[in-house]
Amino acid sequence: PLSIMGKERKWILKEPADPEKVGRLSAELGIDRVLADLLVKRGVETFEQARSFFRPSLNDLHDPFLMKDMDVAVERVRKAITTEEKILVYGDYDVDGTTAVSLVYSFLRRYSSKVDFYIPDRYDEGYGVSYKGIDWAGDNGFGLIITLDCGIKANEKVEYAATKGIDVIICDHHLPENTLPPAVAVLDPKREDDTYPFDDLSGCGVGFKLVQAYSQKYGIPFETLIPLLDLLVVSIAADLVTMVGENRVLAHFGLKQLNENPRKGLHAMATLSKLELGHLTIDDIVFKIGPRINAAGRMETGRLAVELLTASDDHTATMIGEKINDNNNDRKSIDREITQEALEMVQNGSALSTDAATIVYNPTWNKGVVGIVASRLVEAFYKPTIVLTKSNGFITGSARSVAGFDLYEAIESCADLLENFGGHVYAAGLTLKEGNLDEFVGRIDQFIAGKITDEMLTPVTDIDAKLEFSQITPKFFRLLKQFQPFGPGNTNPVFLTENVSDGGNGRKVGAGGVHMKLDLIDEKQPFHQIPAIAFNMAEFYDYIKAGNPFDICYSIVENYYRGNTTLQLRIKDIKERDEFI
């Protein structure tokens, strides 16, 4: 389907992998060539690699002491615990930050009663380590602060903490600047001088490595860390880090924990999201659980999220869960409203820029949802997007990019105009003085225009392989499910099937009939119908209902509904066929 700008998605069929490798793997594993091709494209070429891909093992986790500064960090935590020094676990207000704080706080509480946590207020303090937070720590006698999912750029703040006699250990996964903060230890796999084998951990993942290292050094059995993995999988899924290597292993066991024996707070969230334990997937976290936990920090306070995730009884978990669910409903209506206003600004010419980038500003918008609105505008206009609002006298906002374009670099090129900025290649935050706004818009627009290519501005659907419906057998699907957990870098494969049509049961579903449920057939199997769902594609309904043939690209998902599990195609895009056969 078209985006608002009428940009049609370009379908790109990936080159097949080396046929010799595919043939060898297919024979060794006794699997379909299509599946062997998918595996080789994901770097799985040998029987051994296939074993560790299909059967993730906790033995595949890296030694946490390979991370720079880990030994110092562990010793400093040990000193705090043995001398009964007060430890403050400090983290960002989003899902990654609040799960990280909950994980490290829960662990430390087992060995010390002198532990507390602190989540900065999104509106009053903003992102990252704040002077207010350090003052609070100082006033309350804390000697050690452990920062999670933030701190890699907090040079002045760490110096300020030192003047109050407070040591800082930083656990972060954001991109560092040239000079690291003068902390006791800086744990960040993205450090230039770090040789840790995997650099795409979530913030919570870095916190977990600290806890794992502490346990390893002081004889605490790894089994006691397993109950923390439900928090970790929530961060890995919601923060959209790559689902490869160590992350995939941790997510695999985290999902197991989440489904079989989750903590009370996550159980409450699943129930409020109308999800059933035993069947939760990464998608459920990304689309249902993650946004709810995030809503606490967007609408009220991130502290609520930590209270939920560390709740020890059902009553507390349900009570806080319901409060957070209300926050999420408020967030939804506000983000709908602001998205509508932003779309209108772009269309009526009152945006700051609609050239190389989409840049919109409204001082009254809610700071908590600008990131979501930026993502919606990328969907609509498919170009790098910055959504700005006003907070505490500064202009502040969120930036989101399109595939292949490094927006962080573009923001960094305007560093002299900014009070602060941070983030990743595709998603970042920034703050500037109002007087610098016009120059910032002009400069970043020019920078983006000079770097971005037409290819990057065309939305693409990457297709893994062509498939005929007859190939989708129970065995094929059973093996495909073992590719999970899916996420960036290990996506649910996208298949292309040509010349299909609806078997006659096609109907519109959803509020306002914007989605379609279809029962598809292809010409080779006219009596074998495969159920499919197409979100936001009702524009094709009349064409399909008239019996016309079309091509689809889709992924195959398991649809769990009222005790029944069925296979379903989730359609990503539809193309009408010109020629009628």
Predicted regions located by residue number:
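Flexible, glycine/threonine-enriched loop-and-boundary segments that flank and lead into catalytic domains
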Residues: 348-374
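Divalent metal-coordination and catalytic microenvironments
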Residues: 39, 92-94, 146, 172, ...
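Short glycine-cluster motifs
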Residues: 386-401
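N-terminal small/polar loop signature for handling phosphorylated ligands or for N-terminal nucleophile
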Residues: 68-181, 186-188, 337, 341, ...
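Functional cores that coordinate and move charged inorganic groups
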Residues: 139-144, 150, 155-298, 302-308, ...
